[in-house]
Regions:
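Secondary-structure transition/capping motifs at alpha-helix termini
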Residues: 168-173, 262-265
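Catalytic His-Asp segment of secreted/periplasmic serine-dependent ester chemistry enzymes
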Residues: 183-276
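Conserved SGNH/GDSL esterase-like catalytic core that processes O-acyl groups on lipids
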Residues: 1-45, 54-159, 242
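Extracytoplasmic/secreted envelope proteins and their assembly/folding machinery
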Residues: 121, 125, 158-165, 200, ...
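Intrinsically disordered, low-complexity regulatory regions of nuclear DNA-binding proteins
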Residues: 48-49
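Conserved N-terminal glycine/acidic-rich loop preference
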Residues: 133-145, 154-161, 169-170, 178-217
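Extracellular low-complexity Ser/Thr/Asn/Gly-rich intrinsically disordered segments
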Residues: 176-178, 244
């Protein structure tokens, strides 16, 4: 999910660089999500060409895996059309991987997206199955509820969220899911958004049904109208929907703190079960 690249040129080059970070995690393989079927382009890899070990194509789902003999942290990827017929190239995303232990983190989504956006994406379920998650956090709903009170149907939101949960669990039935309640916000900068509380109700209902945890950002902020207080303290932007950089960092820190505490609680519960 996110932005798709579409091009009909005969020669396309994409450069990968760590320009704005001192941390440059290396990778030993890359997965390129693209058009389904036979890919009408040959791949070249610039200075990394000699390091290519093998290339594998999945025509059914639409991706290509490229494996390198050594770790690299930059790449010049070139697509050259291998047919006279003018066929376009569509790129849906890239995955950079290595064999190091730890967590592989993937973020999906774009500004303005709601649950309906993901459900309308015909490639989402297939691509998720190709790389099934072990842990999936749902942090979506602000745009779903960013409508007048009488135009928001909590049951439609609940059904859409449950459909998404089922897609994730179909990809990996053992996947752990974290549901999050959207943050407090204002509608058109001046109207209190009373839909968030209604979202929270159905999110908690699903959490109880599927035995999954919930992180209540709405409650954490102070509930209805609290985004005004966060804005006054430099934590939200003037639209009182999006956070500032400082606000997003605080939100991330609070999520990690809650997550670590939750893991500790689960560990204690497991130990008590063993004693019994």
């Amino acid at each position: 999910m996110g932005a798709a690249l579409s091009c009909r040129d005969s020669l396309i080059t994409i450069y990968f660089r760590h320009d704005k970070s001192n941390v440059k995690p290396p990778f030993s393989s890359i997965r390129i999500y693209h058009n389904k079927g036979e890919l009408p382009f040959d791949l070249q890899f610039g200075e990394a060409e000699l390091l290519v070990n093998r290339v594998e194509h999945n025509l059914e789902i639409g991706y290509t895996d490229v494996y390198f003999t050594d770790l690299i942290d930059t790449l010049d990827l070139q697509f050259s059309r291998n047919t006279k017929e003018v066929l376009g190239l569509e790129i849906y995303g890239f995955q950079f991987m290595n064999s190091d232990p730890g967590i592989s983190y993937t973020s999906i989504g774009i500004n303005g997206a709601g649950l309906y956006t993901y459900l309308a994406n015909e490639n989402f379920e297939e691509q998720l199955t190709a790389y099934p998650p072990d842990f999936f956090t749902f942090s979506v709903g602000t745009n779903d509820a960013n409508v007048p009170f009488d135009r928001f149907d909590p049951q439609v939101y609940k059904r859409n969220l449950e459909k998404m949960m089922k897609i994730v669990l179909k990809a990996n039935p053992k996947c752990a899911i974290l549901l999050t309640v959207p943050n407090d916000s204002y509608y058109h900068r001046k109207y209190l958004n009373r839909n968030i509380a209604r979202q929270r109700e159905v999110i908690i209902e699903l959490a109880e049904e599927y035995q999954q945890p919930v992180w209540d950002v709405y409650g954490l902020m102070g509930e209805l109208g609290s985004s005004k207080l966060w804005f006054n303290n430099g934590l939200m932007q003037s639209d009182m929907v999006h956070f500032t950089s400082v606000g997003y960092h605080l939100k991330g820190d609070l999520l990690i703190d809650a997550f670590v505490k939750y893991l500790g609680q689960m560990k204690q519960i497991d130990e008590l079960k063993k004693i019994k």
